[in-house]
Amino acid sequence: MRSSTILIVLGIAILAVNGVATALTRDGIEMGTQEKSRLLRSTSTEHETDEERKFRFKLPSFRFKRRVKVPKVAKPKKKNPVMANRARKYHDVLHSDRGYDVYDMMRSDKLTLQELIEFLTTYGQIDKNGIKILTDGLRSYNIPKAYPVAK
């Protein structure tokens, strides 16, 4: 066989394989996502009548926008820097390794648990975890619920 006939036979074989591959993909056996979406779009509009097209419309978006009223944010009150520093000390001790020293500080300042929690929340130095730490350790440290008022 000559080399030219071999090349012709190989060319015909390549064309045949390519034709079979395209025929299989056209049948939907190995269809890509782009071809699937194109096929879906073309079949979805085939069964639509003129009456159905009349009812298909978009609402204008500018008419249905709601105006949201934003409440005015109150200006934060100026806080006493001395008290803020004291609250920061409570916070640092509470979240350190010696967290139970807070109860000694409470005793020395004669603060109840509720007063301490209110004090720390006003100065933004406590979170839910800190409140849990305080209330769990309260039982072992005998912090009074209220100190007696001197008359």
From Swiss-Prot:
N-terminal signal peptide: 1-19
Organism of derivation: Plasmopara viticola
Domain notes: The RxLR-dEER motif acts to carry the protein into the host cell cytoplasm through binding to cell surface phosphatidylinositol-3-phosphate.
Any one Gene Ontology cellular component term annotated for this protein: host cell nucleus
Protein name per the record: Secreted RxLR effector protein 30
Protein origin, superkingdom: Eukaryota
Induction or repression: Expression is up-regulated at the earlier infection stages.
Function as written in the Swiss-Prot or TrEMBL entry: Effector that acts as a broad suppressor of cell death to interrupt plant immunity. Inhibits cell death induced by cell death-inducing proteins, including the PAMP elicitor INF1 from P.infestans.
Family the UniProt entry places it in: Belongs to the RxLR effector family.
Entry annotated with the keyword Oxidoreductase: no
Protein localization: Secreted; Host nucleus
Motif (RxLR-dEER): 38-53
Keyword line: Host nucleus, Secreted, Signal, Virulence
